[in-house]
């Protein structure tokens, strides 16, 4: 089987909801990382076979946002592009599809990743095309209905986290402690400059003067403490345990990697960041969608012929502290090797981009530590999981 490698990885800093990136459309964020990933790899735009980008909230974004991002990044019109939506797994699924295309001989070099601007998701007015004869009409928030709502049980993703907390005995205290840990790790990583290499600046136009370079994750809480979190009320169930502080945020950002065969990398004289060892997808009950990483990770590890104990480093997305803790409980891996620089609770969760964002962070930290075996995994709204294993020589 063809060995598939990742030769470069880049992401934007993650913006908070209504923050620095709020006015930058998702395709423009995608263009920034596509261009940066190619430049870092030393690959020319015309050498690219295809661009695959995840984006969940596409209402009002225009035709095929991935194609828009590719064109804005300077790729020639002859290079095709595809937008995919696998909710929170979109950015990682894009990388899997890139690997598929290369292994099948359909492509030589693929740029894959994800982009999202949750701040810009529009409200829509269902039924308005035919008009309203009388009575009130209701605006629907596409961010919630298309990104955060369990269509099968008609409740918010937060309720699925409450379900996990009850089923696996995850207490409020444990969730808050986990969230504080994520924030503290991310704050320390920021101060140590650990994200600097993976982040490409986004130029934010100003009303007057030169654009401002946005290059620092702005959702991270400085000086987070258990006391500051423990007083918050539950966000989804009055008698529940999930709060705004022990859940991930609503965020904006993008990430991309350049994928090719090991033979192509050798031909071009490129040193891979890692080889894609295996990947897997899985389904679970939508009521406990946060458990998706368990079967997906087990499947990916089995295909790689690894055990959880073989892993040197992991990025396991923190949609909610409750589900992250339950996943760690079920997998039995060394949690000191998981999200060592904080996770989505601190950094943020721009849903279409997060799959690739955690992969980018994983690859850069593996390089820093000279780690050999890594795993990226996410839960997915609707009851699924994705996981991808990478190896450095």
UniProtKB/Swiss-Prot annotation:
pH dependence: Optimum pH is 7.8 for the condensation reaction and 8.1 for the reverse cleavage reaction.
GO MF assignments: acetyl-CoA C-acetyltransferase activity
Effect ascribed to mutating residue 219 to A: About 50% loss of acetoacetyl-CoA thiolase activity
Keywords: Acyltransferase, Cytoplasm, PHB biosynthesis, Transferase
Keyword Transferase set for record: yes
Notes on activation and inhibition: The condensation reaction is inhibited by free CoA. The cleavage reaction is characterized by substrate inhibition by acetoacetyl-CoA, which is partially relieved by free CoA.
SUPFAM superfamilies cross-referenced by the UniProt entry: Thiolase-like
Reactions performed catalytically: 2 acetyl-CoA = acetoacetyl-CoA + CoA
Enzyme class label: transferase
Main location: cytoplasm
A single Gene Ontology CC term: cytoplasm
InterPro entries: Thiolase, Thiolase-like, Thiolase_acyl_enz_int_AS, Thiolase_AS, Thiolase_C, Thiolase_CS, Thiolase_N
Mutagenesis or variant effect for residue 248 to A: About 40% loss of acetoacetyl-CoA thiolase activity
GO process terms (BP): poly-hydroxybutyrate biosynthetic process
Active-site residues (renumbered): 88 (acyl-thioester intermediate), 349 (proton acceptor), 379 (proton acceptor)
Annotated pathway: Biopolymer metabolism; poly-(R)-3-hydroxybutanoate biosynthesis
EC number: 2.3.1.9
SUBUNIT field: Homotetramer.
Family per record: Belongs to the thiolase-like superfamily. Thiolase family.
Entry-linked PANTHER family: ACETYL-COA ACETYLTRANSFERASE, CYTOSOLIC (PTHR18919:SF107), ACETYL-COA C-ACYLTRANSFERASE (PTHR18919)
Role, per record: Catalyzes the condensation of two acetyl-coA units to form acetoacetyl-CoA. Is involved in the biosynthesis of polyhydroxybutyrate (PHB), which is accumulated as an intracellular energy reserve material when cells grow under conditions of nutrient limitation. Also catalyzes the reverse reaction, i.e. the cleavage of acetoacetyl-CoA, and is therefore also involved in the reutilization of PHB.
Name recorded for this polypeptide: Acetyl-CoA acetyltransferase
Gene: phaA
